[in-house]
Design a protein with these regions (language model features):
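Flexible "cap/lid" loop of the alpha/beta hydrolase fold
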Residues: 101-102, 107-137
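Post-His helix in hydrolase/transferase enzymes
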Residues: 240-252
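Conserved HGGG/HGGXW glycine-rich cap/lid loop of the alpha/beta-hydrolase fold
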Residues: 5-57
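Gly/Ala-rich beta-loop-alpha elbow adjacent to hydrolase catalytic centers
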Residues: 88-92, 96
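Conserved loop-alpha-helix segment in the C-terminal half of the alpha/beta-hydrolase fold
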Residues: 200-234, 240
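Active-site loop/oxyanion-hole signature of alpha/beta-hydrolase fold enzymes
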Residues: 34, 43-87, 248
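Active-site signature of alpha/beta-hydrolase-fold catalytic machinery across serine-
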Residues: 31, 98-102
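Conserved alpha/beta-hydrolase catalytic His-Asp/Glu region
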Residues: 121-123, 139-195
Length: 257
């Protein structure tokens, strides 16, 4: 089972489960812990191959979003958590959206930061080039290049550093498995875009998240259960670069439940 960490407020408090993205770990949420634990039980999970869950799935050759989502569901089942709000960043937003499809009763609401709903043409080209080069280049060279492209500006540096420093802990074999998984995600994303969202959802995007923002804007226009808050002058990793703003928006949304 995946490794996790609990901050328990009280037996009556609602649960909030945090899901990081590819290459990260639950440590990506270090700027959220104090704000959220004031009123909620908090569950931080390290996805397979990441953080404290590293090395647990070495015999598995190929991953799917289904099995990764079920990993998370297994943790909540083990802890006897019947319902939780979910907060995800980047690729983690795909996982929580998938959990809402697989086991909707488990999801009370979703907060999706730096959400990925569609890979634009540039990102698809980058993924293809990275896949070709992964056999000859060190995996961190590919990851650092992606980090610089997704978070290109000087003011994105702190987010970029967190992004890269966590990825350094990822084994090469693990990186390749997640990379292949991401390369095959387009059919799942198409399915998500076609479906009406089935849970109250808040999308929090950086105004400078040029790869992913436009797809989210279009999606929210067509889904009455979805809200969008765009943080100006902010890149992809909004919970790090604009932590106070992110926390205030998120907690305001959760206070409605």
């Amino acid at each position: 089972m995946l490794k996790y960490k609990i901050y328990k407020k009280s037996i009556d408090a609602q649960w909030v489960t945090f899901i990081h993205g590819a290459g990260g770990s639950s440590k990506i949420w270090f700027k959220q812990i104090k704000a959220f634990t004031a009123n909620y039980n908090v569950l931080l999970i390290d996805l397979r191959g990441h953080g404290e869950s590293k090395g647990m799935f070495d015999t598995v050759k190929q991953y799917s979003f289904r099995c990764i989502s079920e990993d998370v569901i297994d943790v909540l089942d083990f802890l006897k958590i019947k319902e939780s709000h979910f907060v995800g960043i980047s690729l983690g937003t795909i996982i929580i959206r998938n959990i809402a499809e697989i086991q909707p009763s488990l999801v009370k609401s979703m907060i999706m930061a730096g959400a990925i709903l569609k890979f634009n043409l540039m990102s698809q080209i980058l993924m293809r080039v990275g896949y070709i080069l992964h056999r000859v280049l060190p995996h961190m060279a590919i990851y650092k290049s992606f980090a610089l492209i997704i978070l290109p500006r000087r003011k994105h540096k702190s987010s970029r550093n967190v992004f890269v420093n966590e990825a350094k802990k990822l084994f090469r074999k693990e990186f390749i498995r997640w990379y292949k998984l991401t390369s095959d995600v387009n059919p799942l994303l198409r399915s998500f875009r076609r479906k009406k969202i089935n849970k109250p959802s808040l999308f929090i995007m950086g105004g400078e998240d040029y790869m992913f923002l436009s797809a989210v804007e279009l999606f929210v226009q067509r889904n009455f259960l979805a809200q969008l808050n765009v943080i100006p002058d902010c890149g992809h990793i909004v919970n790090v670069q604009a932590a106070d703003h992110f926390n205030r928006i998120s907690l305001g949304f959760l206070s409605e439940f």
